[in-house]
Amino acid sequence: MASTNDLKNGLVLKLDGGQLWSVVEFQHVKPGKGPAFVRTKLKNVLSGKVVDKTFNAGVKVDTATIDRRDMQFSYMDGEYFVFMDMDTYDQLMVDRKAVGDAANFLIEGFTASVAQHEGEVLYVELPAAVELTIQHTDPGVQGDRSTGGTKPATLETGYEIGVPLFITTGEKIKVDTRSGDYLGRVNS
């Protein structure tokens, strides 16, 4: 339990029948007339839905402890992603729903942050940018500007992104894991 006066960004609250909500923004408001209150913007940890919620100042709210651990992606086992804890060497099977869009950028050996609450995996978080190899892309043709200077390329994970015309098959590039956009070449 914590008071609404103790709210901070990133704190996870248990509200609405046990649902987990992360504090995105908060503001303590002290109007000239009436009691003080706290205006918050909360994001549902599982669905990503964002809502505005107002609490009276000093009210007690349930907090949840989220255990984030760095784990290494080992391999796929059917529909499950198998991660290994680098400290204990324990393996953890994570379903595709919890991995989400991170599946587009995971290759064996990558380290990801796995968030758990009471033993249940909530989500998998990758670093903001990862380095991946272009598995296939067509050669860029001089003067071909119908696509705005980009062409499709397939990464080693099978995910397809748009890259500049000068990128060739086999090159290593940086990719933004949040948007899936090309960030640049990796200097060898």
Curated annotation (Swiss-Prot):
Where does it primarily localize?
A: cytoplasm
The terms under GO molecular function for this entry are: translation elongation factor activity
The pathway that the record names for this protein is: Protein biosynthesis; polypeptide chain elongation
Q: Which GO terms describe its biological process?
A: peptide biosynthetic process
HAMAP family xrefs: EF_P (MF_00141)
In which family does this protein belong, per the annotation? Belongs to the elongation factor P family.
Q: What is this protein called?
A: Elongation factor P
Name of the gene encoding the protein in the UniProt record: efp
